[in-house]
């Protein structure tokens, strides 16, 4: 998460690309934009980390996230569900 916070301004700024022979009279820009809706499917082997890290990355990019915790690890799934309800806006 510290790496995400550190590099987020760099990742979200528009970038200009060099011109080539084919694009001599034009400009090329890459403008990062959110995907929209992201589905994060949790795994059973590292359910907490492999659910919350993609969740943090998708939220920081401006996406709406749907989280589906693993049903193989029910205790971690309940904990993740409870924490997300407590600290996140469900709407």
Question: Can you say where each PLM-predicted feature lies in the sequence?
Answer:
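Long amphipathic alpha-helix in the N-terminal Rossmann-like dinucleotide-binding domain
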Residues: 1-14, 24-29
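Rossmann-like NAD(P) dinucleotide-binding subdomain of oxidoreductase/dehydrogenase enzymes
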Residues: 20-91
């Amino acid at each position: 998460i510290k790496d995400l916070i550190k590099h987020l301004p760099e990742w979200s700024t528009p970038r200009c690309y060099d011109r080539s022979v084919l694009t001599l009279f034009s400009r090329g820009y890459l403008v990062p934009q959110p995907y929209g809706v992201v589905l994060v499917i949790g795994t059973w082997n590292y359910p907490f980390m492999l659910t919350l890290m993609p969740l943090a990355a998708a939220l920081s990019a401006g996406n709406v996230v749907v989280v589906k915790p693993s049903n193989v690890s029910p205790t971690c799934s309940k904990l993740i569900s409870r924490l997300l309800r407590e600290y996140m806006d469900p709407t």
